[in-house]
Amino acid sequence: MDNNNNNVFNNNSDICQQLLQRYSKSSAPQHHHLCAIAAATRSIIQSESLPITPFSYFAVTISTISNSQDSLDPQELSGVSSFLAIVLPLVNQEDVSLDKVVEAIGVLVGILEKGLLESEGVLGTSTVRAFVKCLGILVGFCDKEDWDSVKVGFEILVKFSIDKRPKVRKCAHDCIVCLFKSFGSTAVAKKAGKRIYSLIKENTALALKLSALKEISGSKDEHQEVLHSLNILKPIIPYLTVKDNEKVLAQLVELMSSQSSAFTRHIFDNIGTILDSSGVEIILPEADQIIKALVSYMSSAENPADNVLFAANLAKGIIDKLHDGGMSVWVTYLPLVVGSISGLLTRPENIALPASNILKELINGHIDGKKFLTAKKQTVDDEALSGSEFEAVKAICLVFENMLLSSSEYPNDHILAILSVMFLKLGEVLDFCEKGIILKLADWMIVASGGAYDTKNLQECIGSAVVAMGPEKLLALLPISLNTKDYSLSNSWLIPVLNKYVCGSSLGFFLKHVVPLAVSFEQTSSKVKKSVIREELQAYARGCWGLLPAFCHCPSDVHKKAEALTTLLIPFLKEDSFMLEYISAALQELVNKNKNVLASDNLSEELIVHQTENENLDLALEFKRRCSYSKKSASKNIKALASCSEEWLQALVNVFFESSPAKYQQFKEAIECLTSITDSSLTQRIFTSSMERAGITNDIGEYRKLGPHSTDNKENNSTLLEEVAKRCMILELGSCFIEGSNEDLIEVLFGIARDVLEASHGAGHHEAYHILSKILEKHSWFRSSHLEQLMGLFASVKPPTDTKSLTSRFACYKTLLIDAIQGNMDEENTEAFLILNEIILALKDSTEEGRKTAYDALIGVCSSLRDSSSAKSDESYKKFVDMIIAYLSGSSPHIKSGAVSALSVLVYSDANICLSVPDLVPSVLTLLQSKDVEVTKAVLGFVKVFVSSIQAKDLHNLLSDIVNGVLPWSSVSRHHFKSKVCHGHRGDLDEEVWSCRS
């Protein structure tokens, strides 16, 4: 019978009555017996005029057991024990005197001891468990400073904690744990701890004896007792005294020497618990033996995977404990533990992956290359390199080096990942201890380059070395050199690795070492007769030149080498030069990185775009850390770059005029970033010169307007198109000058764009709208001072039909519309409605491209308003939605349906809009009463979008309005209304209706 049911009884009402109510209808004999015992006990209580309380039931029951225990048969004892197990938890400790507690303990101990002595089966499991439970409660009632009152009962609980019956044993375990929790730091706690230690000591001796016999199967009961004692130990370790834990740990270490696999996990569990709950002073004396035993255990391939990994974690925990406790001995054990766990990296995946994670935690927690640098962290500290910590690092490196050298197999991903972590943690001291590893990895890279292996992870591993030690040291170890006899190139595989992972190097190194290498390849290629070899050498040369952008990832000497770099590279700026793309990327890297630092309040939030594809988070973060400047350094760098920017700009503008439009994109962004740091007067002078060069200025150097051109004949039309083409080219160039332009130059650019829009019928409109959109985006003063002119201009020019021009026109509208809404919250803005009107009408465009452009414009406005940092962003967003809703009351069905389509777009992108603007859905649904086909189609489309986008709980309040509005159209067969309602909405509505019902 289950005795764990006291939680369903309470001490505020008669227990007998509670039992009768619960079990009177039960057909189980034990329930009848229990009710009979309760009734008999109540009769005794009443006959003696005692109160009907749990204590009275307890006192009478104990008295009955004491007086009749010799005459009670097992079945009767079972019933009495069950009843007592129900009653006793309901008794308040204050109600029971200590004398009565001791007396009751004596009664129960007598029964339980008798059960231990008699043959198995006299007392059933449930009976023993019930009495053990009661004994545990009674011992808890004893005086916590009087061991004599506790000793007898506690001793019996300890004996039953290794009982062969699981339920009895579990009950005894629970009682002992509860008692230790209640003992606290009392005198009784110390005595109880000693008793547990003696139990462990006895069973340690037994385990060693069994191990010596090497026939555990022949001593099964004794073997089980050892396991049970280890099981009871784990939960009470946190409550033992420091001294007891020291002695227990010593016993566990001795038990480890038994080499019995049956005890291993239990021993590990208990050592782990001691590790977690104790100070380093307990671990230190036994650390050496434990570490060596764990290392020995991990080295055996026959041991279970779970236990091996537990041992690895345990060894790591000991290292952590010693390290955190300030015990220098951790340095001695670290290589031993790392070496042992590293052997698991070649095991099956279920072992290798967790082992890899454990090693990463060990390395990240205990190896730091910065410790071996001087205070300024610029040079290696020779004294630190001779210390014990660095000796440990070298020993660990030797472990991995030997692993690579002793194996003929390609290193797996786990080994490479660990090496990556090691490289990054060692940083600038990497070349003092990992040269052998890097050389071996290079050998594998040469082998793998033939296509035998996937080199992605190997390249990433070597990339970590590049990030850690820098390309200068790596190339000193693995030089890229040309064999002049057979023209073979050593370590050519390094070029793409450097291209991806160089950061924080120096332009000086690139100029002094990489450039001469590229030049030598070019010179040698010109002397080679065989075309295949010549092309290979040229490719190597390009590869070296292609490292330019990589060496511009946060170089340390921009302020010193900007001029030298300019002198070297400007001659390469020609239209057909392969260097054009490299130079453009390098300039953007140099300028934008430093600009971002100056503009950013939080450097850690900067993104390194070229590194986002890296899956190794540690590597990416380290790359990011190294690729950063202080604001002071960035300011010096920008100043140096600005001093050369005029020369760069002029050279790039020359390339612009020599190139075809198809190649503009290669260098436009470089021009744009340079103009942003160049003095605006210089920028204006260069642009004015470009206008003259394009032939669009008059005799005094001012812009020459197109003027009236007749397009009646081919000759006049051709002349106009030629003039427009010149202005388009200048507008294309001008779009790169926007950020660094002063107001005068912006006015010039606006004049050219306006001239093109007014004078031509579509030609050049894309370029004109594009530059206007950039001006509006970058210069707020222009938006406020030229609003009327712009609106007049846009009104006078027919909306374009080509997608590019329309997209750029709507980009202008987006900026103006957002500005108008946010700037005039309390007023109606005519310009805003004019803009919105055109976008809404475009939603009804006959072409899919035109409609999509309008959709994108609407979503862009919504996103900007919604995500704005302005305190009134919510208010602005709602105002925009209200403006669209206002069109629903318009007179034109075309504009009404367009407005409904616009709202469909907004709901599709953000269904919550229906909740933040409560009038939205009802306003649309009222249009279902309209007789106009176009409007009805749009509303039915809106309903479909709305129903499929919103949550069922939010749909509930609107469901009846939707159903009442939509269903009447299900009977209209014209214009496909019936099919739209029945097929287009039925599934969505059915699903939502059932969701709302549920």
Tell what function each PLM region has.
Residues 1-998:
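Extended, low-complexity, acidic/polar intrinsically disordered regions
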